[in-house]
Amino acid sequence: MFDSKNLVNPHLAGDSFFEKRSSKGILLLHGLTATTNSVRPLASRLGKLDWTISAPLLHGHGESLEKLSTTNWRDWATQVEQCWHQLNDHCDESFIAGESAGGLLALWLACLQTIRPKGVVLVAPALQLNLPDWKRQLIWLLSFFKSTFPKENKSVDLQWQGYSEHSLKAVLQLIDLQDLVLEIIPQLEQDILVVEGGQDDVIGPGVSTLLQKKAKGSEVKSIFVEKAGHHPMLERTSQDYVLPEIVNFLQKS
C-alpha cells in the first residue's frame, strides 16, 4: 500500500512485479503518474495463459511528486532496458506493451534494442498529446515557478492508481521522449497493435494513422473504441472488448 497523501486509490496493488512462468513473456509498461495497477488486467489474462510477466514501477512513481520531478526519461528508459534483458534471460519469445507514456517507452525499446520484441502493443500511446504548442510553451515557462498542477479528472471511480497532480518537469520529459521517438519510428520492424479511445482527452487523434505512415516496415493494426477514454484496459465500457483483442494479437504474433 502506498502513501495516501500522494496517490489516488492508494489501496490498489501498484508495485513492480515479475512472474516467471513459460518461455513466452511480455514487458508491461504503465503511463506517466500511474503505477503497475493500470497494466494488471492484461497481466492477469496473460498469466492464466502461462506467460511470464515483467511489470516495473517506473522511477519516481508510487512515491511522491517531488521524487517524480527529479527523474527524466533516460532514467525510465534505462530501467525498461534492464527489465527487458531480465525478461529475455528467461524467455525465447518476448513482447512489449505500454500504455500512454509506457507506449512511448515501448516504441523506444522496439526501435533501439538488439533483441527486439516480437510484437508491440500500444494502448493510448502518447505519440501526440492533445496539447497545442502554446500550452507546451506555457508548461515550460511555469516549470520555473511551480512544480505541479492538478488533474481535471482524478479517476477515483476508475480503479486507476497514480498521482492526483501532474509534475511539470515530468511532462516536459515526456515531450522530449516523444520528440525522440517520432524521429526513430521508421526503424520499427515489428507487428504493432494500437488501441485508441474516442473519448480520450489526453492523446491527440490519429496515432495509428501516424504510425502507418512512419513505420513502413511494420504491419500496424488499429482498434478504435468510441466509448473508451485514456484507460481502455481499466474502463468498464471497453475492457471486456479490448483485453481479449490484445491477447488475441499477442497469441497470433
Identify the residue ranges that each predicted region occupies:
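Conserved alpha/beta-hydrolase "acid-adjacent" motif
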Residues: 201-207
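Gly/Ala-rich beta-loop-alpha elbow adjacent to hydrolase catalytic centers
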Residues: 98-102, 106
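Conserved alpha/beta-hydrolase
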Residues: 47-65
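Active-site nucleophile elbow and catalytic-triad environment of alpha/beta-hydrolase enzymes
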Residues: 167-185
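Catalytic histidine-centered segment of alpha/beta-hydrolase-like enzymes
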Residues: 228-239
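The serine-hydrolase catalytic nucleophile loop
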Residues: 33-43
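Active-site nucleophile loop of the alpha/beta-hydrolase fold
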Residues: 121-130
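Short beta-strand/loop motif that positions the catalytic acidic residue
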Residues: 188, 194-196, 200
